[in-house]
Swiss-Prot record:
The lineage of its organism: Eukaryota, Metazoa, Chordata, Craniata, Vertebrata. It is found in: Cytoplasm, Cytosol; Cell projection, Axon. NAD(+) binds at residues 167-170, 193-196, 226-227, 246-247, 269-271, 349-353, 400-402. This is Aldehyde dehydrogenase 1A1. It catalyses: an aldehyde + NAD(+) + H2O = a carboxylate + NADH + 2 H(+); all-trans-retinal + NAD(+) + H2O = all-trans-retinoate + NADH + 2 H(+); 9-cis-retinal + NAD(+) + H2O = 9-cis-retinoate + NADH + 2 H(+); 11-cis-retinal + NAD(+) + H2O = 11-cis-retinoate + NADH + 2 H(+). GO terms for molecular function: 3-deoxyglucosone dehydrogenase activity; acetaldehyde dehydrogenase (NAD+) activity; aldehyde dehydrogenase (NAD+) activity; aminobutyraldehyde dehydrogenase (NAD+) activity; benzaldehyde dehydrogenase (NAD+) activity; retinal dehydrogenase activity. Pathway: Cofactor metabolism; retinol metabolism. The modification N6-acetyllysine is found at residues 91, 128, 252, 353, 367, 410, 419, 435, 495. It comes from Mesocricetus auratus (Golden hamster). The record marks 170 as: Transition state stabilizer. The modification N-acetylserine is found at residue 2. PROSITE patterns: ALDEHYDE_DEHYDR_CYS (PS00070), ALDEHYDE_DEHYDR_GLU (PS00687).
Length: 501
């Protein structure tokens, strides 16, 4: 998320203490039913930060009962004024601002995110998104409809009910807010399962949710693993909607489970292999910088990463040269330290997967311009890597890498690059760089992607809908459309004695 004026970045909080490691149900802290816990790892040091209660189906069942009770007709939550729901969300945003330093430090420590980025963009984006949803709370309404006959007809936008929300590890706090903000603003109750790698900011948020004054059972947070806690949410017969951000592979399983259970509503924000097209008439400095930012931001762990870079033939060599020069300027290290540009990957599994894909690029004939291996001997660090002479059939050009790896491909014509850009099962995002307005509009209209950035990249804001085409997901988050994803539309028709226009 971007802002014209950013606050000064303080030093990270020293001597961070982990306060919350239990399951949060009914505004109270609980041990897991099984008694199990799981370790949370600092990816920069490979050391255990703490152990967290491991929720599974039994804990999800408890959370669903609490959420269903809170959603009962006549409950404090159901009878609360919509404007009061908005006030609670505004209050939560204020508490996040108060504890911004702690949350940013926790996010950087647990998720390997560069602290300055966490403080400015993650926390800044969270607070803006929460306030946006708060403002919508008393503006979600129906319409009156001039139906035929002596009938008075109107529509109602009603909350769906109990919503299961499964959060990824790459933007744990931001995705937490993207999920709960619209759900609560519309009057739903929620069960949140944070990623097992990054549960700590979600659990801290539970304490702020209670402090803000949300009634018991409205928000419940159950840390645990996908195949147990996540699967229990997807297949639960008393959950009305599931929202998931993560891989396409898991998204398919969630949609299948939703269909086999109670046909719950589903919102999915899944993987991507997003094309970024640079035409010869583009501002080269701008294009190089945004293309770099688009794939290297947060160690490449972004679903919208500009991971298929198409550069017009006449500027290809110069673009590659500048891109390599830019990548070599990166400083790797502990994300809490000042002057660091790149932190670690989230865990060993992701780290090893990235290195495997880098090796495939070397073997399949791409030219390794820089990087290409592990960095350091502690932590899950990968060198910033740039490949040139990449062809469309290589694994690095087809598979989602989710790491700091830029692959630069060459194109000759507009028609050719559009076909190549769309030749993927994904359709989350795309970028176009050109000074030609006609070309920009033509290409952005032709690209099969949920969001297209022109002469910029990864510029997100709470007011704009976000989501994917094809196998990059279903539904939208953020914006007016993202709000309505958490409502059911009801038509009410009333017989009257006489209708008058």
């Amino acid at each position: 998320m971007s802002s014209p004026a950013q606050p000064e970045v303080p030093a990270p909080l020293a001597n961070l203490k982990i306060q919350y490691t239990k399951i949060f149900i009914n505004n109270e802290w609980h041990d897991s039913v099984s008694g199990k816990k799981f370790p949370v790892i600092n990816p920069a040091t490979e050391e255990v930060i703490c152990h967290v209660e491991e929720g599974d189906k039994a804990d999800i069942d408890k959370a669903v009962k609490a959420a269903r009770q809170a959603f009962q007709i006549g409950s404090p939550w159901r009878t609360m004024d919509a404007s009061e729901r908005g006030r609670l969300l505004y209050k939560l945003a204020d508490l996040m601002e108060r504890d911004r330093l702690l949350l940013a430090t926790l996010e950087a420590t647990n998720g390997g995110k560069v602290f300055a980025s966490s403080y400015l963009f993650d926390l800044g984006g969270c607070i803006k998104a929460l306030k946006y949803c708060a403002g919508w709370a008393d503006k979600v309404h129906g319409q009156t409809i001039p139906s035929d006959g002596d009938i008075f007809t109107y529509t109602r936008r009603e909350p769906i009910g109990v919503c299961g929300q499964i959060i990824p590890w790459n933007f744990p706090l931001l995705m937490f807010i993207w999920k709960i903000g619209p759900a609560l603003g519309c009057g739903n109750t929620v069960i949140v399962k944070p990623a097992e790698q990054t549960p700590l900011t979600a659990l801290y948020m539970a304490s702020l949710i209670k402090e803000a004054g949300f009634p018991p059972g409205v928000v419940n947070i159950v840390p645990g693993y996908g195949p147990t806690a996540g699967a229990a949410i997807s297949s639960h017969m008393d959950i009305d909607k599931v929202a998931f951000t993560g891989s396409t592979q898991v998204g398919k399983l969630i949609k299948e489970a939703a269909g086999k259970s109670n046909l719950k509503r589903v919102t999915l924000e899944l993987g991507g292999k997003s094309p970024c097209i640079v035409f010869a008439d583009a501002d080269l400095d701008t294009a190089v910088e945004f293309a770099h930012y688009g794939v290297f931001y947060h160690q490449g762990q972004c679903c919208v990463a500009a991971s298929r870079l198409f550069v017009e033939e006449s500027i290809y060599d110069e673009f590659v040269r500048r891109s390599v020069e830019r990548a070599k300027k990166y400083v790797l290290g502990n994300p809490l330290n000042s002057g660091i540009n790149q932190g670690p990957q989230i865990d060993k599994e992701q780290h090893d997967k990235i290195l495997d894909l880098i090796e495939s690029g070397k073997k399949e004939g791409a030219k390794l311009e820089c990087g290409g291996g592990r960095w350091g001997n502690k932590g899950y660090f990968v060198q910033p890597t740039v490949f040139s002479n990449v062809t469309d059939d290589m694994r690095i050009a087809k598979e989602e890498i989710f790491g700091p790896v830029q692959q630069i491909m060459k194109f000759k014509s507009l028609d050719d690059v559009i076909k190549r850009a769309n030749n993927t099962s994904y359709g989350l995002a795309a970028g176009v760089f050109t000074k030609d307005l006609d070309k920009a509009i033509t290409v952005s209209s032709a690209l099969q992607a949920g969001v297209v950035w022109v002469n910029c990249y990864m510029m997100l804001s709470a007011q704009c809908p976000f989501g994917g085409f094809k196998m990059s997901g279903n539904g939208r988050e953020l914006g007016e459309h993202g709000i309505y994803e958490y409502t059911e539309l009801k038509t009410v028709a009333i017989k009257i004695s006489q209708k008058n226009s």
